[in-house]
């Protein structure tokens, strides 16, 4: 089949019996965008989007879309499917419409279970496995309780349910079911809106901003993050510290989006606003959902430098931060991957390998599901540093990357 990429996408979409709006929805794009891709009116999507299209169309070989004649297993680039994903997905998609007859769970008890689940998430190297065992029951119980209660109790239950979806967002991210990312982010925000709780709405918005950002919907991400931050502003003088932490985290997200689109001045302006908030909150403060803190703001500075391709700025920020000051193992692992990206941009293979090895030892299930880490490992496997071929193979094996 000698066809351009756009026509190949249309061929496999038609073969799957999938309409253009349905596929576009799974990708977080508009039907008009997909039509432009299929007809060749806009340039071919980049690799991350091609992978998402291949996954949505249930293709095992990326060459079905690229047409280069060489097998390119989607699983190598797209990452693994966690063993518990089906169970979490089942809990999310059990649409129960019959009346709840069982006694609802205690809302304070649900809130405590959620608090403990967050603690597990931040303190475990295998955080996805731990969440995979906790989330199905927590999702079902929180959903049933929110349906069974009335009045103010239902509002309180919906706040907890929004928080459960915010936690689930970390589990479903970077797995081969992108529709679940949109589902949990939308539900987190919707439940918070139904509860009329500004703080929960900001938390749901923070989750949705991640999805919008990764879909390249920059303006929507910035608008939502700005609106959510502004929603909190009238309360900050008297609200708990977490409200200020959430506002700071939203500023940090705006900075990240600007960096992703290459806007240096805007990125650093919002980073500085978030940094001022972190400084006011003190050295011991850390926001549970977003990990917002002084140490993580320094980690954000590394990421801004990397995204803006200013490795000198990124390296200075990295040198100013002891990774051990980041309490969350998952977030610490991500930071080490970002430092590895500095070395990769500089063509430093041994440095890249050393940082990725550290990241794997800190949080094995962060690196296994991180696309940047996967790409760097694939490059290292193709061109290992001198004398490090076996070390690369060992790390690839520990990460679980299926490279022939």
Regions inferred by a protein language model and the residue ranges of each:
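A short, Lys/Arg-rich alpha-helix, primarily the initiator
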Residues: 1-16
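Conserved hydrophobic/aromatic packing and binding residues within compact polymer-binding modules
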Residues: 9, 20-24, 34-38, 65
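DNA major-groove recognition helix of helix-turn-helix/homeodomain DNA-binding modules
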Residues: 28, 48-64
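Recognition helix of helix-turn-helix/homeodomain-like DNA-binding domains
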Residues: 28-44, 70
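Short C-terminal boundary/hinge segments that cap the last helix of small helical domains
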Residues: 58-74, 297
